[in-house]
Each structure stands twice: as structure tokens, then as C-alpha cells.
């Protein structure tokens, strides 16, 4: 399964854990995509103003910036950017709903296999591409229950 109709997609990962960020970058690059990681959420605005990406993957719990606030900020900056939460919080219904209200398009627990995240990325990207073609919006994609 490919996250878009093209051969590759451009991803931005925002996670304060350098090990997780590196793992995701490596995984997505092995799948043929371009990928950049930020381990400091405060870098997001300047990065997005200078670069393009098709999907952002955001951690909820970071020491310097709250993931929910970051999602809201990103949504204001780019209303059409697909945002997927990838969090170690697990399936926390309150956090999930807060992320979705802030503008996230999907929610995945870090406790699930990486292939699950990839499937959610593919579905979110496909849904967002359909929206751009004026297809009625679909529900957010959730994969937090283990």
C-alpha cells in the first residue's frame, strides 16, 4: 500500500524522542518516501514556512510544547495539511478527542506495529486528496485500540 497515488510522499515527523524520529525517518525512506524530522516542536513554524510536506506526524507529549497546541497552530498555518498523531499515550479517549478537535486527521498509538501507522498514513493522505477533489469529507482515521 502506498500513501498516495504517486511513488512517494513527503512527511514531517515532530517527536522529541530522537530514537523514534530516526526510526520513522528510516522506515518511511525505506518505503521510498522523503522525510524530515524535528525533535523540537518550536522549530515547526520556521520549517513549514520554508518547506513543503504532505503529511505531518506529531507526538502529543513533548517537553517544550504541548502536542495539542502544536496541532492547533499547524492547522492555522496550513488548514489542508494532513496531521496524524503518533503517541505513546496509547488509546486515551480524552487525548484522542482533544487532538481531533485541534485538527488532527488520525490518531495512532506507538504501541501498535509500525505497519499500522503506515496504513493510517495511507488512509489519511488518500482522504485528504479526495477532499481536495471536492469529495465529501470522511471521518478521522483512528488506530489506537490494541
For each of these PLM feature ranges, what is it?
Residues 59:
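Active-site residues of response regulator receiver
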Residues 37-55:
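Acidic, metal-coordinating helix/loop segments flanking the phosphotransfer/catalytic sites
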Residues 94-95, 112-122:
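C-terminal output helix
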Residues 21, 63:
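The feature encodes the CheY-like receiver
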Residues 69, 90-106:
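Alpha4 helix (beta4-alpha4-beta5 surface) of REC/receiver domains from two-component response regulators
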Residues 46, 68-80:
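Short amphipathic alpha-helix used as the core "switch/output" element in two-component signaling
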Residues 39-40, 66-69:
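Acidic catalytic/metal-coordinating carboxylates
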Residues 86-87:
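Hydrophobic/aromatic residues positioned on beta-strands within the core alpha/beta folds
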